[in-house]
Amino acid sequence: CPLRRQRQLCIRDRSHAELRPQVAVVGHRPTETLGRGDAERDRVIEELGLREWCDRPAARVSTCVAARMALAEGISSGAPVLLLDQLLAPMTSKWRARAVACVAQVARTGRVVLWAEHALDYALGAADSVVEIIDGHARQVEASSWSSTNLPPTPLQEVAARSGEGIFASPEQAHARLAATALTAVPSPQPQQPKGPVLARVDPAALRLSGGLIDVRAGQVLGIVAHEPVQAHRAARRLAATVRPRGVNDHLLHALLRQTSVQRACDMVDRRADRPVGESMELANKVLGPVGARRGAEHSEGQQRLLANVLACAGGQVVLWVDPGWAVDAASGDHLVQTVRRRGTSVIMASRDVDLVARWCDRVLVVDEHEVVADGRPGSVVADLPYPPQVAQVFPGGHVVRTADVALIPGSKAEGGRAHAQLV
């Protein structure tokens, strides 16, 4: 997503040594301790909530904090070009919105921002144009008119299309504009979600949590979220270990993919799970195409995450996914979820991305410290989520998390034309 290219920078006939000081590459970790210094760096530190972390080494902070530190370092470098690589993947939804605002502010100063990002639901609102590369062919269009033949629309694109608007840069802008045009959201008919058989009924005490019994059902995607992602990860791993004691450890799957070819990793996992050799490879080919001959480490970060999710499916009826949307494009992720659903597999997933939870999950457990504080459909627990999904921000107070949950119609001027939604 290129942002506001107000400065021309010629790179022809320049060596890497000449270009290096002109470009700041921002990944998931800073190159050194952030520290405090000039006014620009201090301002970014405040905006990204890094005051208490700026003097700590990146190795001693969470991945979300480290990614924000990397962005602050890149912005304060003064380089005329910022190259952002999947910046939002490690961040929780709350900080994604803050990071996008910081990047947009940098672009307004005239610096060039080139951003490779799969979390388009946030990044697209800050972009001036989008370069989409399909089968080696690049296509650049204005962000306001961009739509993809390969990727599903973002929630804000869907709301804009259904309301007759061009584009919304943020949920706040969408809410304000819908209210100003007297558009009101009313609930769409909710299809009855099929309830598969209960595979296990777990006492949360076994997970070192308090709360009611937790049902794990066949064909259901159960999301676990928390204010601190590590709490959700811990609860998901304990729940999966309780339901399927012989399941494959997700850390081992990532390590296996780094060390060998995809084909060999799939075969090894199939043998360990006493499944016909070739089943995991068949699923990987369905989701990613023919990838067996290459080593896992040769694939992109998002593809490695998808492959680990595929290998986890060898665990049987219950599958554990930890941050399954990390640097994964929406089309591939949706395809994997649909494929797993058709197989009747139960998925337990921990995620830091509340918009992904809203899109994929049938049920959500919200964990706070040592307690399950909410358990239900994504829309019914929206008030307890660490951060509201974008659709919930467009229609606050309505228990709405998906655009499919509502229909937009002209609102009553007697109600002030307020955009709102209500589920029954």
Question: What residue ranges belong to the model's regions?
Answer:
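ABC ATPase C-loop
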Residues: 75, 216, 312-313
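ABC ATPase nucleotide-binding domains
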Residues: 148-207, 387-424
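Single conserved hydrophobic/aromatic residue that forms the stacking wall/gate
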Residues: 1-7, 11-13
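H-loop/switch region of ABC-family ATPase nucleotide-binding domains
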Residues: 116-118, 351-352
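A short, surface-exposed alpha-helical micro-motif characterized by mixed small hydrophobic
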Residues: 123-125, 357-359
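Q-loop/switch helix immediately C-terminal to the Walker
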Residues: 16-40, 251-280
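Conserved ABC ATPase "signature" region
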Residues: 40-53, 276-292
